[in-house]
Amino acid sequence: MTNTATSVELDLQVAVEGVELPSVQEMELWVKTALRDSMDQAELTIRIVDVAESQMLNSTYRGKDKPTNVLSFPFEAPPGIELPLLGDLVVCAAVVKQEAIDQNKPLNAHWAHMVVHGCLHLLGYDHIEDIEAEEMESLETQLIESLGYNNPYQEQ
């Protein structure tokens, strides 16, 4: 399916204070871009969290006792029921900011990358095996560049 007009219902939950965040409109654009060739419509939640919540969730669901940039929780509908629910993304604002600084990237460009990256995970993409990683990174690069940002995997 090629669809440049994906309809997105975004539930944005901000569970952290005093951080610089992209606008809801930017996040919706990034989600629509990530989903444009996969879904006509989608509903998802993006929850912005602090380091403690990110670390707790990463430890609980991935067995890694440290905060991470983005976690993806796909929604799986019961068999025979089709719903536009894609799932949830949990993004740690502090980790995204520090990574942007460490990688010498504009903060919004890194936010865009993390949202696109998380959406691709919700669609079933992964980067555990090298071949999967190459496919996912190639698609991410195309999507991020279509948004006007630099290749996220090249040093800035």
Swiss-Prot record:
In terms of InterPro entries, this protein maps to: MetalPrtase_cat_dom_sf_prd, YbeY, YbeY_CS
Q: Which UniProt keywords apply?
A: Cytoplasm, Endonuclease, Hydrolase, Metal-binding, Nuclease, Ribosome biogenesis, rRNA processing, Zinc
One annotated GO biological process? rRNA processing
The entry's cellular-component GO terms read: cytoplasm
- Localisation per UniProt entry: Cytoplasm
Tell me, what is one Gene Ontology molecular-function annotation carried by this entry? metalloendopeptidase activity
EC number, as in UniProt: 3.1.-.-
- Note the Gene3D superfamilies from the entry: Metalloproteases ('zincins'), catalytic domain (3.40.390.30)
Q: What cofactor does this chain's UniProt record say it requires?
A: Zn(2+)
Q: How is the cofactor bound?
A: Binds 1 zinc ion.
Q: What class of enzyme is it?
A: hydrolase
Q: Kindly report the protein's main subcellular placement as a broad class.
A: cytoplasm
Where Zn(2+) is bound, by residue? 117, 121, 127
Protein's job: Single strand-specific metallo-endoribonuclease involved in late-stage 70S ribosome quality control and in maturation of the 3' terminus of the 16S rRNA.
Give the family this protein belongs to, as stated in its UniProt record.
Belongs to the endoribonuclease YbeY family.
Q: Which NCBIfam families match?
A: rRNA maturation RNase YbeY
Kindly give the PANTHER family that the UniProt entry links to this protein.
ENDORIBONUCLEASE YBEY, CHLOROPLASTIC
**Name of the protein:** Endoribonuclease YbeY
Species this chain originates from: Shewanella piezotolerans (strain WP3 / JCM 13877)
